[in-house]
């Protein structure tokens, strides 16, 4: 599955939401992607449009223009039958550090994060 978006929106620690880390985007086709985690939880919430899933064991790889989210085969229903979601993005280079920090916060202890930025 693939989405194209102009920007990845990242919040590494939202004080107003009990320190929840959030990464989200809206595709050029109007689809919404949301990846969140509260610091005291052992799982990650992934929402695609209006379909939420609770997952662990995600692998996420970030490039300057691409984000790849890989799920276990048993969790492919979260991505409508696919085992990965590729998001092509045009996030400004100056904002990628915040995206990286957010992904580290989301995946720490629950998954794998690889930065190729």
Per-region residue spans from a language model:
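The feature represents the first ordered module of a protein
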Residues: 1-63
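Residue-level signal for well-ordered alpha-helical segments
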Residues: 2, 46-48, 76, 80, ...
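Residues that cap or initiate secondary-structure elements
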Residues: 28-29, 52, 75-77, 93-95
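Extended Gly/Ser/Thr-rich low-complexity repeat segments
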Residues: 33-42, 78-92
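Short, low-complexity, polar/charged sequence segments that are solvent-exposed and flexible
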Residues: 41-44, 54-55, 65, 87-91, ...
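A short, structured beta-strand/loop element
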Residues: 57, 61-77
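Mixed-charge, glycine-accented linear interaction segment located at domain edges/termini
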Residues: 81-117
